């Protein structure tokens, strides 16, 4: 299990950030941050998202966008407005936005090779 401190903020107000501890979960698609912290930072939910739990039940959570910062890396990714009982998770979309991947053996984030497909025109 890897837990790291990551800064979270509103992309529209990047000077205002909060430090939070996150469980790094590369198997989770989205990051989860407590709703009260996101709202305090000025981040507003945009849509509702349904999730299927391992026990077969479904839950619904609000989803918005947040700015994430880890050391010198900054990225914007979708974020789930966590409710009571939800863990702070840093998911795959946020890891990719930060250009990082989880090295589970060393329990740290490593640079993610960034690939860009470019179509070159023939001369």
Features from the language model and the residues they span:
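Pepsin/retropepsin-fold aspartyl endopeptidases
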Residues: 1-123
């Amino acid at each position: 299990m890897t837990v790291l401190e990551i800064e979270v903020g509103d992309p529209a107000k990047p000077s205002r950030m909060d430090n939070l501890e996150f469980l790094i979960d590369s198997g989770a698609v989205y990051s989860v941050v407590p709703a009260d912290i996101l709202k305090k930072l000025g981040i507003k939910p945009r849509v509702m998202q349904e999730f299927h739990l391992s026990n077969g039940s479904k839950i619904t959570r609000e989803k918005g966008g947040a700015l994430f910062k880890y050391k010198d890396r900054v990225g914007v990714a979708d974020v789930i407005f966590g409710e009571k009982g939800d863990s702070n998770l840093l998911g795959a979309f946020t890891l990719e936005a930060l250009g990082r991947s989880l090295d589970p053996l060393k329990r740290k984030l490593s640079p993610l090779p960034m690939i860009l497909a470019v179509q070159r025109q023939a001369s």
